[in-house]
Amino acid sequence: NSEIKLSWKKVSGASGYSVCMRKNGKYPQIADVKSGSTLTYTVKNLPNATRENFKVRAYKTVKGKKVYGVYSDNWNTATNPQPAKGLKVSSVSYNSVKLSWTKIGCTNYRVFQLKNGQWKEIAKTTDTSYTVKNLSQKTTYKFKIRACKTDDKKANHYGKYSAEVSATTSKAPAVVTPVSQ
């Protein structure tokens, strides 16, 4: 499951804030932030790969009753995509490794390679396969991927990493040298 952290600017004189999430076209309250100085709320246990809409409004407590202000602008945001899965090595040569994986709902996939003990992003693709080229012969390489979903505000949301896979490149073919006649 995913979580989304909402934050807003302080409203002068507010006793607290009502956090609302769209459901069936309405915005019922999902949280009561009971401090006018608390300016964030994290919504937890949201399903992966969904779009969610939120609004926040300040309130002031007057004689024991809450008097609400107007709603904020709408937050329309995406939750993290599902974890990437099904990563496997499809083919190996002396200088390349072809990876493939299972399609899930996301904007693109990020491919990572373990280099000098650190995972480095080496590619971004919308396909469900990628060929890593220019590798050294007879060398073992490790790879993993993760899905990325981009929301309306161009913010990226990442799923969990796949399990890693490894592949060992083969020995380069012998070079045939022609003999002159």
Predicted regions and their residues:
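Extracellular low-complexity, O-glycosylation-prone stalks/linkers
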Residues: G13-A31, K103-I122, T126-D127, K144-R146
